[in-house]
């Protein structure tokens, strides 16, 4: 999976699916409280974060209240990440192998600078496009689980179980109810994923260059025993830092679509489509309503995306080294 056409021979889609599944589930479980708080904030008219936390803390089972909806969230994020990373890798491999989008320059990593990643190196437009397409496809497949997750986390519905939530949605809204807000979700997720991959790859390249251009950093790398491929903790640190910054930027740009999407999924009868929902929210609550939950979403996305991508890249790196029979340097 390192650069270009031989990448697909070095690791199968199985590795990408498994790595994506594991990283997605782990990040979802750890960050479920932040996701639940974001949903509660976006469903109401500017309820404060402290008030929401206080209400959850006063429930009979505090831990269970904060981790409500963990199962659908873990399933959605886990399998969503698995599908996303698998399809993203396939798209990136095909672009690199067949020289698609060559007019805007597929990067030749063999002659390029040292990089913290073993994944294909593509141009900015290729990174933006493949990230957006892969996320839109994964989002459509996982949309029913997303609807159940959001409804189950919300206090607008008194669902006792995940199965009960799914049954009620089907009986009251039909099969179409499982895809409420897909337009807003796709408009949010596709640009977010595309921007994230674009920012992430650029930041990794720049941070890798800094590490090997600054004498002190170069000395530190040598002391760690890290060679040209930047294996081990240095690579993981660069990937994580790049992920945090990339997620923060992409989240801030796409948050209005996330706020609109949540309203459509929670109250589909009141907010029937993307345009109407946006106008209604701004008209009744002001522009600020489009940025409800931004702080929580930015914090959660920064950590979850960075964590998922760092774990994913590390698992793939180790799988490739094991595949080639090389020693794994941590």
From Swiss-Prot:
Main location: mitochondrion
UniProt record, GO biological process: glycine import into mitochondrion; heme biosynthetic process
Ranges: Solcar repeats: 11-94, 122-206, 234-318
Membrane topology term: Multi-pass membrane protein
InterPro entries, sorted: Hem25/SLC25A38, Mitochondrial_sb/sol_carrier, Mt_carrier_dom_sf
GO MF assignments: glycine transmembrane transporter activity
HAMAP family linked: SLC25A38 (MF_03064)
Family: Belongs to the mitochondrial carrier (TC 2.A.29) family. SLC25A38 subfamily.
Name of the protein described by the UniProt record: Mitochondrial glycine transporter
Species this chain originates from: Sclerotinia sclerotiorum (strain ATCC 18683 / 1980 / Ss-1)
Native organism taxonomy: Eukaryota, Fungi, Dikarya, Ascomycota, Pezizomycotina
């Amino acid at each position: 999976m390192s650069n270009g056409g031989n990448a697909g021979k070095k690791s199968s889609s199985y590795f990408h699916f498994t790595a994506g599944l594991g990283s997605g589930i782990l990040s979802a479980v750890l960050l479920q409280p932040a996701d639940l708080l974001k949903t509660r904030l976006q469903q109401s008219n500017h309820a404060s974060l402290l008030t929401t936390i206080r209400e959850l803390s006063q429930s009979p089972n505090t831990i269970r209240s904060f981790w409500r909806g963990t199962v659908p969230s873990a399933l959605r994020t886990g399998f969503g990440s698995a599908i996303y990373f698998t399809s993203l890798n396939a798209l990136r491999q095909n672009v690199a192998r067949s020289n698609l989008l060559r007019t805007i320059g597929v990067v030749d990593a063999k002659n390029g600078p040292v990089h913290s990643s073993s994944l294909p190196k593509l141009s900015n437009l290729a990174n933006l496009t493949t990230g957006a397409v892969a996320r839109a496809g994964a989002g459509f497949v996982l949309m029913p689980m997303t609807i159940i997750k959001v409804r189950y986390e919300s206090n607008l519905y008194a669902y006792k179980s995940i199965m009960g939530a799914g049954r009620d949605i089907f009986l009251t809204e039909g099969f179409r109810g499982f895809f409420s807000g897909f337009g807003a979700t796709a408009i949010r997720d596709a640009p977010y994923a595309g921007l994230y991959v674009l920012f992430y790859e650029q930041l990794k390249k720049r941070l890798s260059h800094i590490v090997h251009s600054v004498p002190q950093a170069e000395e530190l790398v040598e002391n760690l025993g890290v060679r040209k491929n930047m294996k081990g903790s240095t690579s993981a640190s660069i990937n994580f830092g790049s992920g945090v910054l990339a997620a923060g930027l992409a989240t801030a740009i796409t948050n209005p679509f996330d706020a609109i999407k949540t309203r459509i999924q929670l109250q589909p009868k009141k907010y029937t489509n993307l345009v109407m929902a946006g106008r209604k929210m701004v008209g009744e609550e002001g522009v600020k309503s489009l940025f409800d939950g931004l702080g929580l979403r930015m914090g959660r996305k920064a950590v979850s995306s960075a964590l998922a991508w760092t774990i994913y890249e590390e698992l793939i790196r180790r799988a490739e080294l094991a595949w080639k029979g090389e020693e794994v340097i941590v």
